[in-house]
Amino acid sequence: MFHVNAWGLPYSVPLSGARMVFPGAALDGKSLYELFEAEKVTFSAGVPTVWLGLLNHALQNNLTFSTFRRTVIGGAACPPAMMDTLIDKFDVEVIHAWGMTEMSPLGTAGGLQTKHLDLPKDEQRKILQKQGHAIYGVDMKIVDDDGKELPWDGVAYGHLLVKGPWIIASYYKNEGGDVLQDGWFPTGDVATIDADGYMQITDRSKDVIKSGGEWIGTIDLENLAMAHPAVLQ
């Protein structure tokens, strides 16, 4: 319960009248699958590495889920290949989410709008692969290196800044001094925002690679590697 998500699902689950199941230290694929089946889990949330182990176990043993129908994936970008497997192979709805400890913790949540329901599957999937809309109470914007705000066109990418009533203004004992930039908290992420307000993380500011005069996102490289059948992790 030390993690920031202790402020999220442990409150929202009982408020909705649902039962909560904790996996404890057993986070390997086999243990998780047996827990899901024994406790008839319908919804779960976790980081991609957790789902990687669970999916590998299910695929290698030709297993299906009897009750598991929805998952929220955050903490890192969900690889497209993983999302495809969850949706197409196991009929599990995937909700992409993003947040930070400093945001208490949720910032955005993904999902399709009504106008997207008639789009081809591959176009819908591209939307679901984004981190989603800002939740109620959270404002966001992207800026260039000079602090100039960039357009929401799905093409321009820049430093992601957020603000809201529960987003921190400073760290404990003011370590690091004033962290806000004109009232906005710098997340350290590089992102794009499209015309419909869908945000997509392209990288961490410190992780972007410059090659041949072009900036390359490490997330793109990771997704390409994860999509290869010979790559486990």
How would you label these PLM feature ranges?
Residues 2-42, 57:
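Conserved AMP-binding/adenylation subdomain of ANL enzymes
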Residues 15-18, 38-46, 55-126, 139, ...:
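Gly/Ser/Thr-rich phosphate-binding loop
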Residues 37, 44, 164, 170, ...:
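AMP-binding/adenylate-forming catalytic core of the ANL superfamily
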Residues 49-51, 78, 167:
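Alpha-helix capping/helix-boundary segments
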Residues 75, 99, 132, 189, ...:
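Active-site glycine-centered loops adjacent to acidic/histidine catalytic or metal-binding residues
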Residues 116, 130-137, 148-182, 214-216:
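Conserved ATP/PPi-binding loop(s) of AMP-dependent carboxylate-activating enzymes
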Residues 143-144, 187, 193:
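Hydrophobic alpha-helical segments, especially N-terminal targeting/anchoring helices
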